[in-house]
Every structure is written in C-alpha cells, then in structure tokens.
Amino acid sequence: MINRTSIIKQPDKISFFYDVYKLQKEYQDSLISGKSNMNFIWLGEHQLCYTVGRGSNMDNLLFSADEQDVFKIDRGGEVTCHMPGQLVTYLVLDLSNLNKDLNWYLRKIEKIIIKTLRSFNINCSTKDGFTGVWIGERKIASIGIGCKRWVTIHGFSINVNCKLENFNKIVPCGIKGCQMVNMSDYNKNVDIKEVKKIVKKIIHEEFNFNFVSE
C-alpha cells in the first residue's frame, strides 16, 4: 500500500541553510534505509547564502567564496541565492511510491509553482531549454533537485519580496543576463505567509498527501 503521509515543517523564523540541509539528509537516509516510510516537506526562508550544485561553474560566483556563506551541495543546477523574502520548499519524497521518473517530477514541481503564482493573478510559464518558472524573459522561481535511490532532496524557491540585488553577485542559474523578479513586482500586496499556505495546498492537490507535524 502506498503511503501518502508526509511530515511537514513550516518555521516562521529564518532558518540557517546548512541546518535544514542536514535535516533533509536525515529524512532521505531514513526513507532509503526503510527506517521511515513518510515523506518530508519543508517550507520556509533562509539567511542570505549562495548554493552551488554538482558540476557548477565556479566562475558564476562573482565574489570570493569566503565573503559570503557558500554551500556546495548534491543537487543539479548552477549557483543560486537564498535570502529572507524568498520562499524555499524542500521535498524529500520516495518516488518509488509515486512515479520513478525524474522528468515527471520536475514537470510536477513546475506545475505547483505555476498554479501558486496564478493564484495571485501572476501569469507565468516554463521556458524551453531551461528549468524554473518565468515571466517572459524574467525568472521568478528556481528548481534544483537531487535524487538517490529514487528518494528526492532539495526542491524549489519562489522570489516573493526579497532583495533582488543579492543576485547581482552571481550569474543566476548559470544564465548570463538572467533577470530575476519578485511576486511583489506584479502583486504589491503579496504576503509570504499566504504564499506558503497556497504552496502547501497545491502540493496536497498534486501529490494527494496527508500532512502531519512531527
């Protein structure tokens, strides 16, 4: 029988990136080893930091790595930036119980983001040849995942009302000339707590999960 139960954490405070990364790894290891059969979802915000995916071009970091918090992690994709005002969602899911297809999973994440933004009357779409979600030529949401023995890690981020100038220190997602935007550029009254509620609701709709607090 497929377990559709997911532990969910939604901290209100800013969370240190590496602490949450270690937490994801613990849940991933528990699913792989069979110690747990529950998925894990985390929604929140990080302190200002930069993360670098597997095989990233370090030239896309436009500063010395000792000037800011930089984390090299086990996800696909290039360098990106996290900060307050950006909603980050991590999904540690056992795809063996859903669909053992990473392309399907990436399209599912894009769908969750697009449905979320459209709930706030923000028209957006995917872009051929690129991951993430875009408004024209501007990028509003980034995706980066890892997967080990069909158990996923990492997830996606949506710029809600963050300080976009922090992206000037990198080549976002390795795309030269990429311009990042906020939800607040299109909906001035957007609130990150409301965005979090909508993301949770749509994840429930798309995966048919039952959420429990640990």
UniProtKB/Swiss-Prot annotation:
CDD domains associated with the record = LipB
Decide whether keyword Cytoplasm is in the record: yes
Q: Which processes are annotated in GO (biological process)?
A: protein modification process
Give the EC number.
2.3.1.181
NCBIfam families in UniProt: lipB
Report the sequence similarity comment from the record: Belongs to the LipB family.
Name by which UniProt lists this protein: Octanoyltransferase
Which taxonomic lineage is given here? Bacteria, Bacillati, Cyanobacteriota, Cyanophyceae, Synechococcales
